[in-house]
Amino acid sequence: AECSVDIQGNDQMQFSTNAITVDKACKTFTVNLSHPGSLPKNVMGHNWVLTTAADMQGVVTDGMAAGLDKNYVKDGDTRVIAHTKIIGSGEKDSVTFDVSKLKAGDAYAFFCSFPGHSAMMKGTLTLK
């Protein structure tokens, strides 16, 4: 089973994919995020955040209030299944999470929680 994915977030506010499938044979799953653009993280920073589809908007709203120092993710937010830090031009970050946290048939969303980005930078994650 392929238990990781490489994703890029660019200066055009786009992720390189809008759908991720996690094989249920995987014990853990790793997301490797990179930023091929030229803009710094305070201007065009990106992260990768995973929640249920239902929780996405609330996490985005609370993340905006948390600010850049907290990677636009509220401290101790139990709705967040996994997240990377905010990265800028030329930077990378990875996150690994337990696949046991996912349920087959549930709808999951991944997105960038940098203010204003989630409308374009989002996708679905499915356990198969």
Swiss-Prot record:
Swiss-Prot/TrEMBL keywords: Copper, Electron transport, Metal-binding, Periplasm, Transport
Annotated Cu cation binding sites: H46, C112, H117, M121
Domain Plastocyanin-like: 1-128
Gene3D superfamilies: Cupredoxins - blue copper proteins
Subcellular location as annotated: Periplasm
Superkingdom of the source species: Bacteria
Listed PROSITE patterns: COPPER_BLUE
InterPro entries membership: Azurin, BlueCu_1, BlueCu_1_BS, Cu-binding_ET, Cupredoxin
Gene Ontology CC annotations of this record: periplasmic space
Main location: periplasm
Keyword Nucleotidyltransferase listed: no
Name listed for the protein in its UniProt record: Azurin
Native source organism of the sequence: Pseudomonas denitrificans
